[in-house]
Amino acid sequence: EAEVAEVQAWWNSERFRLTKRPYTARDVVSLRGNLRQTYASNEMAKKLWRLLKNHQANGTASRTFGALDPVQVTQMAKHLDTIYVSGWQCSATHTTSNEPGPDLADYPYDTVPNKVEHLFFAQQYHDRKQKEERMRMSREERARTPYVDYLRPIIADGDTGFGGTTATVKLCKLFVERGAAGIHIEDQSSVTKKCGHMAGKVLVAISEHINRLVAARLQFDVMGVETVLVARTDAEAANLIQSNIDTRDHQFILGVTNPNLKGKSLATLMQQGMAAGKNGAELQALEDEWLSKAQLKTLSEAVVEAIERQNNIGEEEKRRKLNEWMHHSSYERCLSNEEGREIAEKLGVRNLFWDWDLPRTREGFYRFKGSVTASVVRGCAFSPHADVIWMETASPNVVECTEFSEGVRSKHPQMMLGYNLSPSFNWDASGMSDEQMKDFIPKIAKLGYVWQFITVGGLHSNALITSTFARDFANRGMLAYVERIQREERNNGVDTLAHQKWAGANYYDRYLKTVQGGVASTAAMGKGVTEEQFKESWTRSGAVNIDRGSIVVAKARM
């Protein structure tokens, strides 16, 4: 009973003031073992929560990008306050099966948790290394030497939860154990999962995604952690949905309005085509022709069109009926198909032909009309179960960001939002000026987007420097390395210039000397280490050519 009371008191804290749970504290305690454990990731989760709430209060945002490896994590730590671990990057560069591919979430489900552990171990190591180095300094030296917070909270990609409830629970357990301060889970089908900027995305019902979020929260509660939970929706651009079981989804499902197709489903037509030996382009042409005839509309669109066609009433009566219908069918009301038909009948729309089963795909999916409004409905539904809401978008659009923010925060005013500053967008084709691009992050931060991230920023930056350096190195040899890398590391204060020290040779020398009474003839950083060259002082003046133009290196000191 004492443990149940302890959990209840924890839930009553400010941290969970806005969180809704459909289970009890007793349920949580019953799922715990007798051996209580603590997790380092919980300290990072608390740190992340404080950080995001501070950004929310100030109208600012944590900006970050997907990190590939410890090199990127240590350099990011000097300038950014969170770290992102991208499923896309893991899928393309570092799966546990070592089989690369696109972001279809078909890699082993421990792939992203393992990458989190890789980076979290690196964070802790460089934190220890820095502490050892600073303890060797005098008070004055410490005051002059900038301190780097290497322990930046990691937010990781949980994709769709990787299956049913038990799969989601086990995935979340892995993330906590491996060091994630936060994770995000999206509302796509786990069977057909796609990158948020690919076509063919299939949503699950709102209720199914809520179950995923509840499963995640339950696992965090069982482990006694405050891991930040981000709910992502792909409803802005999705065109399919797995099920029509949730009435909140009904207003966005498309149906056939052409009565000539009554009894002629698309799935049956495609099956007949395959049986007749058609394939590829022929089947696509068959589907395209059927869809062009179907006149797909939402139920609301079909009812509006039917009212406008009523010729036996005056224009004033027609406007009255349209206004009444729009009142009943406003998106906040989440009108069900059955309720909509009843209201339409009362407005004189009888025998309306609208069929959402006829256009279902061969896999059985319903047609869905994606939009910001659909995302708002889902964002509002997910808000009681998540800490941050993220709408995936097709382009960087401040108007859409505003619409989503206002829609969600009209119902949940204290909800924090996230935004993907995706490299899948062609930012130069967005219509924004350079100044507008510069102001994009702070502008939407004021709308509540407290966490903003370039999902695969690490991959693109890595590819760019490798490609440009490799090309130059092939042509100019070591001069290319010295100009492009070594001098730039020195000029910008990048600590990998002395890579032995960066990797921790001094740190492990301390171990050797401590074990051997303060002296070790085999110390890695002893006399003869080539890194001593970087302590020599010299001056070099002159012009250095780098591709286009040149820079002047004056008094470049080692």
Swiss-Prot record:
UniProt: substrate binding residues:
S86, G87, W88, G196, H197, R232, N420, L421, S422, P423, S424, T455
**EC number(s) per UniProt?**
4.1.3.1
Q: Which Gene3D superfamilies match?
A: 1.10.10.850, Phosphoenolpyruvate-binding domains
What is catalyzed by this enzyme?
A: D-threo-isocitrate = glyoxylate + succinate
Q: Which residues bind Mg(2+)?
A: D157
Gene Ontology CC entries for this record: glyoxysome
GO function terms (MF aspect): isocitrate lyase activity; metal ion binding
Cofactors (names): Mg(2+)
- Give the pathway annotation: Carbohydrate metabolism; glyoxylate cycle; (S)-malate from isocitrate: step 1/2
Q: Does the record bear Membrane in its keywords?
A: no
Question: What Pfam family is a match for this entry?
Answer: ICL
Print the keywords alphabetically. Glyoxylate bypass, Glyoxysome, Lyase, Magnesium, Metal-binding, Peroxisome, Tricarboxylic acid cycle
Where's the active site on this chain? Answer: C195 (proton acceptor)
Gene Ontology biological-process entries: glyoxylate cycle; tricarboxylic acid cycle
Span of the annotated motif Microbody targeting signal: 556-558
InterPro entries noted in UniProt: ICL/PEPM (IPR039556), Isocitrate_lyase (IPR006254), Isocitrate_lyase_ph_CS (IPR018523), Pyrv/PenolPyrv_kinase-like_dom (IPR015813), Pyrv_kinase-like_dom_sf (IPR040442)
Instruction: Write out the annotated subcellular location.
Output: Glyoxysome
Q: Which family does it belong to?
A: Belongs to the isocitrate lyase/PEP mutase superfamily. Isocitrate lyase family.
Q: What does this protein do?
A: Involved in storage lipid mobilization during the growth of higher plant seedling.
User: What do we know about how this protein assembles, alone or with others?
Assistant: Homotetramer.
PANTHER family per the record? BIFUNCTIONAL GLYOXYLATE CYCLE PROTEIN, ISOCITRATE LYASE/MALATE SYNTHASE
Protein name, UniProt field: Isocitrate lyase 1
